[in-house]
Amino acid sequence: MSRVLLRGIQCHACRSNVIRSFISVSDVAITPLAGGSRSTAQARPPPLSRNFSSQHAKLFSNQPSDNAELVVDPIPEIHTGEETEGQPEESQEHIPWYLKEEQVEETIPHPLRKQQPLPPLPENPPPILENLLEHISVDIGLDNLSLLDLRRLDPPPALGANLIMIFGTARGVKHLNVSADRLCRWLRTTYKLRPDADGLLGRNELKIKLRRKARRAKLAKSAKSTLTQPDDGITTGWICVDVGTVEGGQFRKPEEELRKVGFVGFGTVVEGTRIVVQMMTEEKRQEIDLEGLWRQKLERNSLENEGLPQPQAAAPQEAGDIHEQLTVPPTNISHQISHATQISANYEQRRGISTGSRRYQDATSDTWGTSQISPNSETTHLEPSAPSSLTSLSHHFKNIPPHEAIYDLGQGTHDRCSTAFLQQFYQEVARAPSELASSRRIELMCIAIELHHPGYRKPDLFQAIQEHVLSNYALTRAQFLQILDAFLSFKPDLTSNPPRLLLPNADMELALQIIDHAGLRGLNLLDSTILVKLFVGVSFRAQVYPVKEKDLPNSPVIGNRIPVPLNTCDAVKRVQSRLTRVKTAAKITFTTEQYMRILRVLFDQGSYSEFWNTWEDMALAGIARDKALYVFLFQLHAESDGWQCFTTQLLNCIPMMERENPPVHLDGELAEVTQKCITIAYPEIIDRVERNEQNPLVRMWHRCRVAIENAAAAGGRGQDSTAPYVCNHSDI
């Protein structure tokens, strides 16, 4: 110890206490002073010396030393009362920093946590989840974090059972790639996991793509052009990081469901929880709305998996208010409840409850044409006539003119009582089972839209279909095709400027959404019927011919053909070409009627090359080109002009008719339309016939005239007017 320090302390007792306080650290005891020296310590030492000794012993001596009994400190015993009196003075004394007790400072939360709160943890979370959210929010810096617990989803998602999905927004494309890369590295080093990042480019791969993009941009700049490729494979804006299966947090199903009778499966039950992190840019997250789609799936699944209520006196209100509630006598209610089957809350038994509801309604109806049901009667003997009644009402429009059908349909979707038909229809709908009522209501709206009723709109039909689907009702193929026809139906407006000849984009979008939903339900979309409907739906609804945009105002109507912009016509042809390639790739075969619809569309828009290619494809596909098909061919050309450059192809079909299998002979009906086509292609044919020129065209005219005369003579004698005219091929 420094001598200067000891010299500064004049009191011997204080110097002894100072030395004792330092040496007590090494557990060395000091013998107390003799009695003679005790007298010198009668005076009270300075408070600093005592405080120094006591505080030092508290701070440094963790355990009592072995010689603690030999150490005697007489000063605290003598001056105990004085110390208690002098405590207020000690509190005012200056305390050095090394004598102050350390105070535990409150932990200050991270500033990013205030700006971006972490989503609450779900029930029974896996241990890694909290650290993962903390790392994603603070270290990586993703914003707007949200968490979806998909562990209760039944059936489980395609990513796997016991799934927890985390959504986060990156500040940009570069931040997105860096965040995904750092997250994968953190998971590998910290938890020894093997994450899979779908959409993440490796560092070398990203450098290569950026280098190639810069090279292409440089070449395009030197060529004075711009890069028009919309997707360069770099700026996807979406990376899905599959963390993998982690320990803990799995959802345990009740034992009753695990011991379900009749359940058959394979494989083993996967233990643990799978975590998936969806990283997206702000624009991509708003565009796809993946979080909203999963939330809808969760809400629908929670409704399906809830405990179903017991049968009650009043029928539950279905989605869309399709039918009204009925009041039933208590005897019938007790009878139905007593005969209801015991069911559990799953998908199949839910339809069982719906069946019970149908029987309950059928038994209480008085207008089905059945006798009054007694309380002791069996519900299995009921034969309701509601389906037949609704079916007859739906077929009512097939036997009346369109204007009468539009009148019977009333003012619109919400009109239910303005006409006698609507009153009867909705009375039957109120008594019918809910699923049948929903189907017939959709069918009625489809019929009205196909008739171009102004009060029935396609968005209302789409809403009715959504209610039908959310009610877990079936959607048959016939219903789907009828709905598709309604959305693709369109009445051209020739009076507008410019004329509206194409289906609006909004209607096509609704049709495509219905097609997507049908595909999710398992319906075959690579079908000739659907392909032809789409082919006709995207086409012009009148005969047109293309002109340049600048020449459109001065272009007249030629015959029946209306001028349309060249770029619009090219866009329609591109879509038709894609559908044709789909047909070829999927090896889809068309029927004769479907080929006729495609031929008419191609002829109306002036695609004559594609028209004759399709005509030849029919023969290659093995389609029998019979008389009806040839009449259709010549009738198309007889109704319009503009095809004169393809006259040779048309006239070559006449000798080809008798080479078909079976052969098609030239009769009166065929001869009439053939003469019309010859007249359009060669207006001077009458002069040539009068001059009796010797050429194939005149001989063909005479052959058609003879066939018409034979048909007229056969009709006058009461014989078949379609008797063929057979001639020698040398006459042609």
From Swiss-Prot:
- Which compartments is it annotated to reside in? Mitochondrion inner membrane
Region (Disordered) residue spans: 355-393
Q: Where is the composition biased (Polar residues)?
A: 355-379
The lineage's top-level taxon is Eukaryota
Task: Write down the InterPro entries for this protein, in alphabetical order.
Answer: Atp25, NT_sf
Q: How does it sit in the membrane?
A: Peripheral membrane protein
Q: Is Nucleotidyltransferase one of the keywords?
A: no
Main localization (coarse): mitochondrion
Q: Could you tell me which residues form the transit peptide?
A: 1-52
**Coiled-coil residue spans:** none
Q: Which UniProt keywords apply?
A: Membrane, Mitochondrion, Mitochondrion inner membrane, Transit peptide
Q: Name one GO cellular component term.
A: mitochondrial inner membrane
What the record says about family reads: Belongs to the ATP25 family.
The free-text function statement in the UniProt record for this protein reads: Probable mitochondrial mRNA stabilization factor.
Q: What is this protein called?
A: ATPase synthesis protein 25, mitochondrial
Source organism per entry reads Ajellomyces capsulatus (strain H143)
What gene is this protein translated from?
Answer: ATP25
